[in-house]
Amino acid sequence: MTLLSNILDCGGCISAQRFTRLLRQSGSSGPSPSAPTAGTFESKSMLEPTSSHSLATGRVPLLHDFDASTTESPGTYVLDGVARVAQLALEPTVMDALPDSDTEQVLGNLNSSAPWNLTLASAAATNFENCSALFVNYTLPQTGLYCNWTWDTLLCWPPTPAGVLARMNCPGGFHGVDTRKFAIRKCELDGRWGSRPNATEVNPPGWTDYGPCYKPEIIRLMQQMGSKDFDAYIDIARRTRTLEIVGLCLSLFALIVSLLIFCTFRSLRNNRTKIHKNLFVAMVLQVIIRLTLYLDQFRRGNKEAATNTSLSVIENTPYLCEASYVLLEYARTAMFMWMFIEGLYLHNMVTVAVFQGSFPLKFFSRLGWCVPILMTTVWARCTVMYMDTSLGECLWNYNLTPYYWILEGPRLAVILLNFCFLVNIIRVLVMKLRQSQASDIEQTRKAVRAAIVLLPLLGITNLLHQLAPLKTATNFAVWSYGTHFLTSFQGFFIALIYCFLNGEVRAVLLKSLATQLSVRGHPEWAPKRASMYSGAYNTAPDTDAVQPAGDPSATGKRISPPNKRLNGRKPSSASIVMIHEPQQRQRLMPRLQNKAREKGKDRVEKTDAEAEPDPTISHIHSKEAGSARSRTRGSKWIMGICFRGQKVLRVPSASSVPPESVVFELSEQ
């Protein structure tokens, strides 16, 4: 879960529209004395408080026993036979001193009064009409002044005796709100509901303090946001979530295709791609879980807007929601560990010569997959104990709890270590470039390009998540769009750079495409064997120059003209342009032996001087070569595109590639 999810779902994935209204009105009403940092909001009832007595049933205690021995309490207790009323001086110190005594004890103390028990039994109402229906036909005994019933758009407050501090359980249906705590509403001595503190105007419907309902992490989040324009924050978060879903879908597609490429072609199975594949698997797992949760929340939000009911499949399923978030954090932790392995392996191969000959795959696998299991298990256990999932909140806001640093601490350490690896790798690259006598501008360009390419692979862009500016909506928008663009498209960028734009991968794909086309009846697409080696067999026609027979040092050697292209390549790209005649005879020996057996000879022993090639075979070979050249000449532009990367096809094996060549190739692209 991210800060974006906290702002989107803050106070209620179940009732997003209601919580948006709560935040808007909480911000407009100012801080409360009992919770200076929490939100508060005004009642929406248009009824004027009167001295008429009406009562209906309520679902939670409205009165709270106050310890008379407390020095801050100047109140007295009055027992009129109907209810036990605490006359309290509503000073901030007194409100802070109110104890959170057991609700059942309060109910037990008031059991002797039947009318008051009705008030404490239930007060379930979902709108103004329901609240009105509860109280309009019930009359209290003439025992004193009462504040009239009122509906504050969240709770239905029954008539309350004058001078009483009414407390009602916090409304359900919101994430980040503890329903075991109480919202507070003050009935003044004159029978009117009290306005918010420091208010310049009297508000007849009164004011409800919902500050105590928020959990500590939500209060800290509201402190960070500071601004009162909560609608702007929520709107920015929604647009960012749309951008995030698009990036995750694109990353998922690119990562899956890259995994298929790495697993299909055996020539790509080297040490670097083994690490790449594990990193891609961790990223795919993380993206799939995140998309599942986001789409479930999106579907739930749309349905609630129309029906005001929760249709969430994941959140309303016991253990499924918790398991989803635990798996999400495990996948994220595994992704960071494999990013660390990427940085460690590349750094050691470039800078430490002792690691170049070894590849501890088992150690890397345990570090990348087993260590995150241990970390996630410890975090999940601590979080479940801290959050009390019996409230049905499904680990919501767990990223705001202190236990989240069990996971976030090692991730931050991985980012910092990879940043150090990156700095050292760039230092080595600059040293190599200086030895090549490149210009300063060229050195800087290649170093910066290599650094930019390595940033997503090493996960350094995730460092921006730790720097969330929430003081103003503008700063939050810049941070939100930029950070979530980089993180959601991270998988796409990694797959693009390290798979689709990799020269070796493109060469393998090109060769596979050419082979498939040649098998399907397009011989002109067949890859030439010569392109896989440093030298090539000379297929020039017989009109090519031949060394004079009188020269003993060059007898029997055929030489290609210096400016003639060989097999579609320049002469400078071939290290061998001459083929010895004995080698040709050696290739023809099986044919000569078969011909001798047909004539009935038991054994054929010929030396290089005795063996003569069959002119018929040579004629057939020349004819086939001429036919191939004619077909090639007809589709020259196609062949040029297909085998434009034949130089890349001559990449040596992974073991012989210099360790720093990976970074150099990236800087050249």
Swiss-Prot record:
Side Extracellular, residues: 1-244, 296-334, 388-411, 471-480
Observed phenotype of the null mutant: RNAi-mediated knockdown in small and large ventral lateral neurons increases total sleep in both the day-time and the nighttime and decreases sleep latency during daytime only.
Ranges in the topological domain labelled Cytoplasmic: 266-274, 356-366, 433-449, 502-669
Predominant cellular place of this UniProt entry's protein: membrane
Membrane topology qualifier: Multi-pass membrane protein
Expressing tissues: Mainly present in clock neurons of the brain. Localizes in all 4 s-LNv neurons, 1 LNd neuron, 7 DN1 neurons, and 1 DN3 neuron. In addition to the clock neurons, it is also present in approximately 13 pairs of neurons along the ventral nerve cord in third instar larvae, which do not overlap with dopaminergic or serotonergic neurons. Not present in DN2 neurons (at protein level).
Sites carrying sugar chains: N111, N117, N130, N137, N148, N198, N308
Single GO biological process annotation from the record: regulation of circadian sleep/wake cycle
SUPFAM superfamilies recorded: Hormone receptor domain (SSF111418)
One Pfam short name: 7tm_2
Biased composition range(s): Low complexity: 26-40
Keyword Membrane tagged: yes
Transmembrane domains' residue ranges: 245-265, 275-295, 335-355, 367-387, 412-432, 450-470, 481-501
GO molecular function: calcitonin receptor activity; G protein-coupled peptide receptor activity; neuropeptide receptor activity
Family, similarity comment: Belongs to the G-protein coupled receptor 2 family.
Protein known as: PDF receptor
Organism: Drosophila melanogaster (Fruit fly)
Origin organism lineage: Eukaryota, Metazoa, Ecdysozoa, Arthropoda, Hexapoda
